[in-house]
Amino acid sequence: EEREYRIIRTDGQLRWLSDKCFIARNADSTHGPIIVGIAEDITEKKQLEGELQRLATIDVLTQSSNRRYFFECAQREFDLARQYATPLAFQLLDIDDFKRINDTHGHQMGDQVLQRVAQCGSSVLRRGDLFGRIGGEEFALLLPGCQPDLAEQIAERLQREIQRLVFTSPDGQRFGVTISLGVTYLRASDPDLSAMFTRADAAMYTAKRLGKNQ
């Protein structure tokens, strides 16, 4: 038999142990079987497993959910919202003129922009909301149980937070960034999550055509 469990040491440290037990027959038939147990500290192994699991779900650059994990979670929330007829809001945002930022200020500056925008996205989340980077300069928010008026407030707050960002390039130039954002809500007629994504994507590109920063 093999078991894994946690213990708390006398110094307060949490450790993981692997405990293996097996029965060995005694060559001396006058005595019963011998029970052998081996305990091994597997704390480092567990920590590594946890880190690998974390890395499988996040975008390393921005520390937000990666595309695969975001849509896995979004699909579960979509199914729950359909099942229980609860509201669900979906938002897509794209950093305006990001290629120009990279070309003008360099890719390291572009990475910094992505990181700061992701921080803004995480800052507006409620408990249970999901934020992820789903493309180069494209992010998504999923807001379970969120009515349209509240979702609009969250979108406006996110716009304001990003508009406040100020960056300084290596040559001393100061610049800001804006986003174009598309918002949609679950409809009874939506057959799947992709229907919401398509609407949000269309709304986002409409915002870009109408002048961006909206």
Regions found by a protein language model. Name each.
Residues 148, 152-155, 184-213:
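Catalytic-core segments of nucleotide cyclases and related cyclic-nucleotide turnover enzymes
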Residues 53-72, 93-107, 115:
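Conserved nucleotide-binding and Mg2+-coordinating catalytic segments in signaling enzymes
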Residues 20, 31-41:
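PAS-family sensory domains
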Residues 40-50:
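PAS-associated C-terminal cap
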Residues 53-56, 67-87, 118-126, 144:
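Short regulatory alpha-helical coupling segments
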Residues 130-133:
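A short pre-motif secondary-structure segment
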Residues 38-40, 93, 144:
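PAS-associated C-terminal
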